[in-house]
């Protein structure tokens, strides 16, 4: 009985591993039609009795402002070009902070955020964290850094029902994603930790201050020239 159950479990895990590898490989080239987060937000709106229409237009890498690319890295993951999906020192610092009884603080890299937004549900559990680590490793293994950032910029949430750089640029500033200024890019990056609560186009004092910090970090990183560090040597 137990051996039969273990065999079935092993087969299920093998099928899951093979299927997830196949999906991640396909998405290396094919634009994702949607994300788990988008589905979650849509279902939530139905249950709340306020159905929303999702705004999202896939925009290729070359049609997204370099200012936004650097702003997101500056605000969310300054070690993006050098790590392999996990910022261990940041994770250790977050764990120590949380153990001291402070407000729970995360340390997710951009790759981890892509894994979560694309494939997983919201919430905190060891199962979800384990799956997040699995998908993060696969994404780092099979995708280039440019592809990871491209998918992130097309799947990030920037308002109620607003997903991706193009929809965010149109919704908040009335321009295409390719025409975002440095200030606009910094304001969009500033609201990423809480895109429903905060507004990029009508920034609170805190968001404005955070956007200013992001602009300074962008300059320290070297501006758009920083993107050259997302080197092609990581590609298979």
Swiss-Prot record:
UniProt catalytic activity: [GlcNAc-(1->4)-Mur2Ac(oyl-L-Ala-gamma-D-Glu-L-Lys-D-Ala-D-Ala)](n)-di-trans,octa-cis-undecaprenyl diphosphate + beta-D-GlcNAc-(1->4)-Mur2Ac(oyl-L-Ala-gamma-D-Glu-L-Lys-D-Ala-D-Ala)-di-trans,octa-cis-undecaprenyl diphosphate = [GlcNAc-(1->4)-Mur2Ac(oyl-L-Ala-gamma-D-Glu-L-Lys-D-Ala-D-Ala)](n+1)-di-trans,octa-cis-undecaprenyl diphosphate + di-trans,octa-cis-undecaprenyl diphosphate + H(+)
Keywords on record: Cell inner membrane, Cell membrane, Cell shape, Cell wall biogenesis/degradation, Glycosyltransferase, Membrane, Peptidoglycan synthesis, Transferase, Transmembrane, Transmembrane helix
GO molecular function: pentosyltransferase activity; peptidoglycan glycosyltransferase activity
Subcellular localization(s) per the UniProt record: Cell inner membrane
Pathway assigned in UniProt: Cell wall biogenesis; peptidoglycan biosynthesis
EC number, UniProt record: 2.4.99.28
Predominant cellular place of this UniProt entry's protein: membrane
EC class (word): transferase
Topology of the protein relative to the lipid bilayer: Single-pass membrane protein
SUPFAM superfamilies, per the entry: Lysozyme-like
Gene Ontology biological process: cell wall organization; peptidoglycan biosynthetic process; regulation of cell shape
Pfam families: Transgly
Keyword Nucleus included in the entry's annotation: no
Gene Ontology CC terms: peptidoglycan-based cell wall; plasma membrane
InterPro entries for this protein: Glyco_trans_51, Lysozyme-like_dom_sf, PBP_transglycosylase, Pep_trsgly
TM spans (from-to): 12-31
Domain of life of the source: Bacteria
Function: Peptidoglycan polymerase that catalyzes glycan chain elongation from lipid-linked precursors.
Similarity remark: Belongs to the glycosyltransferase 51 family.
Protein name: Biosynthetic peptidoglycan transglycosylase
Lineage of the organism: Bacteria, Pseudomonadati, Pseudomonadota, Gammaproteobacteria, Pseudomonadales
């Amino acid at each position: 009985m137990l051996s039969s159950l273990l065999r079935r479990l092993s087969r299920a895990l093998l099928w899951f591993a093979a299927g997830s590898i196949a999906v991640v490989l396909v998405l290396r080239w094919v634009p994702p039609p949607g994300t788990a987060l988008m589905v979650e937000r849509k279902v939530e709106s139905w249950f709340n009795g306020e159905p929303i229409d999702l705004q999202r237009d896939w925009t290729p890498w070359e049609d997204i402002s370099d200012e936004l690319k650097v702003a997101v890295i500056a605000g969310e993951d300054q070690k993006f070009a050098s790590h392999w999906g996990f910022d261990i020192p940041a994770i250790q610092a977050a764990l120590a902070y949380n153990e001291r009884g402070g407000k729970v603080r995360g340390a997710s890299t951009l790759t981890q955020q892509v894994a979560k937004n694309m494939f997983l549900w919201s919430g905190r559990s060891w199962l979800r964290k384990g799956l997040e680590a699995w998908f993060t490793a696969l994404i780092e293994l099979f995708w280039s850094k440019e592809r990871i950032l491209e998918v992130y910029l097309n799947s990030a949430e920037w308002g109620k029902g607003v997903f991706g750089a193009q929809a965010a640029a149109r919704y908040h500033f009335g321009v295409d994603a390719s025409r975002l200024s440095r200030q606009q890019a910094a304001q969009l990056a500033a609201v990423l930790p809480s895109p429903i609560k905060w507004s990029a186009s009508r920034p609170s004092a805190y968001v404005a201050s955070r956007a200013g910090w992001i602009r300074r970090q962008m300059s320290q990183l070297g501006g758009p020239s920083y993107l050259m560090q997302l080197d092609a040597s990581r590609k298979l």
